[in-house]
Amino acid sequence: MDDDFEEVGGRFRRFRRRLKKDWSQLWSDLSDPKQMRFPWPINTPLEVYEQVGAERFDPSSHRYQMPFFWKTLAVPGTPSWALLVCIIESTFALICFLAVMLHYAIFLPWCEVYSKPLMVFFLTALQYAIFYSFKVIFMISIVERNARLLRLQLFFQYATCVFLLLDAAFALAADFGGYNEELIYCNKNPLLIRFVAIISLIFLFVQMFLRIITVQVYNFMWDVRKFRKSLNNSKWRYRKRVHFTYCSIMQEDFKNERLQNKTKSVESRFRDGQEEILKQIQRKQNVTNISIAPDEPFDEAQLPQNARSISTLSTTPSNSATVSSPLGKRKHHTVSVSSKKMRDNEGKKVKVSRRKPGGIKVQLEVDYETARLLFSPKKNGRIPNVSVEEVDMEFDEDDDSHPEEHEPLV
């Protein structure tokens, strides 16, 4: 028997030590003033500081200090003060609940009518049940530092003040107002009910001050939550800006590289085309070239009768207001005569016109018969302002009496 008693006593002592240890650990965690700060991450960019607004989250602000007007130094609003408020409210409710239960336990068995006293008893018990339910939520919000649950507790504290006033007014009116309070409380002068009503009126003002303390704790919890959310949004916004800047720079580099590659490919293709044309020209031999150049001089004395050579056809603008093309079409535009002089193959000075901008030079490869037809004045007429320069080419004097055809040059 003694061993069982010692075993039970040892269990109770161990339970008490564990409870004391857990309580001291919880209290030290809730009352630590070092938690009254807004933790900024290491190496936070300056843009994130500016976006969050460091001046809005100052731990030394009066919004996070206790309303102890009798103290000269500020007291930070740690969650331990909210826990103290919860303990005070629960103690008051426990005292009132025990007083009401004791009153009905004493006088209810001797009551003649049970309907009204039982209804008042159950309503009072329901009020205290709801009150303690919200006190449990209050404790959870303090330990977990949940700002939303603490905000719900602030609304309930308003309701507590209202119901304290209503209960006290109802009890005092029934006691001192001449109403037959025996039908409700089963006693002529219920001292316990009167005691509960008086301390409820007193606690009404205490409850308002306790709510102010809870508001200060709630302000810090809510601002910590808002700070974390704002910091997270700013970090993601900064990461997106850096990523988009990097993507735009890479896109510009890729665009410039693609443009350079395209320019190089066009240049290489143009150079290959020129080289291919030059190779084709070099492979050709014994060809008849007819070049139309606007800057060659005109001399009718050089017009051959018979020649077997390469001929050059050039147009020379006249002094008139119109200029004729090699095909006989007249173009109506003014041409200024240049005073530049050149010498022909015989050493004679000839006047040539200034080269027009945008002149072209066309080389045609034709056979002998086509060349005769081009230079025949009987079929085509006289080509105005055209000079023929013979290199090594012979034609028959009679164009009509030469029936055979020559092979075209290759």
From Swiss-Prot:
It comes from the Eukaryota. Residues 310-333 are annotated as: Disordered. Residues 310-325 have a biased composition (Polar residues). This is Uncharacterized protein K01B6.3. It comes from Caenorhabditis elegans.
